[in-house]
Amino acid sequence: MRVVVLGSGVVGVASAYYLARAGHEVTVIDREAGPALETSFANAGQISPGYAAPWAAPGVPLKAVKWMFEKHAPLAIRLDGTRFQLQWMWQMLRNCTADRYAVNKGRMVRLAEYSRDCLQALRADTGIQYEGRTGGTLQLFRTQQQLDGAAKDIAVLQEANVPFELLSPAELKNAEPALAAVSHKLTGGLRLPGDETGDCQLFTTRLAALAESLGVKFRYNTPIDALAIAGGRIAGVQCGSETVRADAYVVALGSYSTSFISNLMKIPVYPLKGYSITAPIVNDAAAPVSTVLDETYKIAITRFDQRIRVGGMAEIVGFDKNLRAARRETLEMCVNDLFPGGGDTSKATFWTGLRPMTPDGTPIVGRTPVSNLFLNTGHGTLGWTMSCGSGQLLADLISGKKPAIQADDLSVHRYLKDVAGQTRPAYA
């Protein structure tokens, strides 16, 4: 079958790779000059299935109000003048109940755990290298309230059989030796030894090369204007003056997926703006060995070979990609507070990207009401974590195979109107 994949971020490239492995003739189209040049370019570098969780959680609405008055708040909201933003935020608020959080987190962990299995198989099969490390993830708590609040996440981890370790301040140095100097600032940590790290852009670039070796064609610097529709099916992709035709089409355009298919269906994928800095390591002993999550500031600090990536925060501000100096200040403050002297933040590069986020946190992967149109978008901050599993899942669906995991609650159908004309809740 001929398949066109729109988008060459980590999700699009993974889709193309697994489709090619399944025997399909695949073409990837992207407006950029190469793979992983937008949201996948400088993310936090984490593959964290155990920390797969929706931003919509109990207590978040009250926290959001408090964060409005904090200098280093992890969340910021600025109205972008669209009705869609207001609708999306309302849907997110509806998912901030304990019941919905548990369901949403459960299915996110399901996909993320499967995706890690797919990544490990990929690595074993191909030997792909991307400055990867398998040292686990350590979530750091600065208050007793944060530590106590981790109980609900631990319950989900136990239910999903995800291994974890709850560490005291004195035990943190066993996972991250450099934290010994700052353990007095912390109340403990939750470590997931099965999590991994690496350079997502490097991974995507090398996966694209592997896909090319399987026959995938990449068309970069190509405009993606619209889908041509005939007889209730997709008849092609309009790329400037050319129409590219195939048997099936995959939309993996991240935050831009929403507007691109708006004439066909409505999907609640909104851009969640995030930031990162990447600093050279100047003192190996003072740098992290794997990756940590600062629960207070929602910031991840990740070790690459000779660099430290510091990323996080969320701004609900539309498609604004301006770099805000105050956000860089927060990132530098966090890494210098936990790993002082480990990296030279004065020489750090500064980046921002738009994560495609759904209000319930779960991505949209699978079939649509249009028989030959498939979606693979809405992964939020977990694009790399979920990319291989989403790509394999999509390849199975397009190939007519039964997926290895439950997939019906991952598709766009959970958002579409039921027979009574009511929009289904995101967790249905």
UniProtKB/Swiss-Prot annotation:
Pathway named in the protein's UniProt entry: Amino-acid degradation; D-alanine degradation; NH(3) and pyruvate from D-alanine: step 1/1
Enzyme Commission number: 1.4.99.-
Positions bound to FAD: 3-17
SUPFAM superfamilies reported in the protein's UniProt record: FAD-linked reductases, C-terminal domain, FAD/NAD(P)-binding domain
Keyword Oxidoreductase: yes
Record's protein name: D-amino acid dehydrogenase
Cofactor names: FAD
Similarity field: Belongs to the DadA oxidoreductase family.
Gene Ontology molecular function terms on file: D-amino-acid dehydrogenase activity
InterPro entries from the UniProt entry: DadA, FAD-dep_OxRdtase, FAD/NAD-bd_sf
Keyword terms, alphabetized: FAD, Flavoprotein, Oxidoreductase
GO biological process, one term: D-alanine catabolic process
Upper lineage: Bacteria, Pseudomonadati, Pseudomonadota, Betaproteobacteria, Burkholderiales
Organism: Burkholderia ambifaria (strain MC40-6)
GO CC entries: cytoplasm; plasma membrane
Reaction catalysed by this enzyme: a D-alpha-amino acid + A + H2O = a 2-oxocarboxylate + AH2 + NH4(+)
Role of this protein: Oxidative deamination of D-amino acids.
